[in-house]
Amino acid sequence: MALLPDKEKLLRNFLRCANWEEKYLYIIELGQRLPELRDEDKSPQNSIQGCQSQVWIVMRQNAQGIIELHGDSDAAIVKGLIAVVFILYDQMTPQDIVNFDVRPWFEKMALTQHLTPSRSQGLEAMIRAIRAKAAALS
C-alpha cells in the first residue's frame, strides 16, 4: 500500500479538491495506484455480490496478523472506491476491521452523498464482504 496515502492524507487530499469532478478524478487516480490483481484471484470466491461492476477483493493475513487487501474492478471509479476502502482498513487486524466503522470517514469526505445509488450499494457490499471475511478470521 506504499503507493496509496494514509487515512489522514486521503482526507486532506480529498478536501483540497475544488469540486466533485476533481474528487472523482482523484478517486480514479487512487484506483490506478492499486497493484495489479493476479488473474487467478479474479475468481467467483473473491467476487463481491451486490456491485453492478465486477469487483474482486482478496484478503490475506500476514505473519504479524495484519490483513493485506488486494482488489480490482472493471470500472475505474469503482476501483478507486476499492482503494479508498483499502486505505481506511490499512494495517489492521481482523478484529480491528470488524470494530472499525468507515462511515464517519465517508461522511467527512462527503463521499456517499455524491455517489449514485448503485455505487453506494456497491460500496456497502464491499464493506460488508470485507467485514464478514475479517470476522471469520478473528
Swiss-Prot record:
Listed HAMAP family: SufE (MF_01832)
Designated name of the protein: Cysteine desulfuration protein SufE
Family: Belongs to the SufE family.
Quaternary organization: Homodimer. Interacts with SufS.
Record's keyword annotation contains Cytoplasm: yes
Subcellular location: Cytoplasm
Domain of life: Bacteria
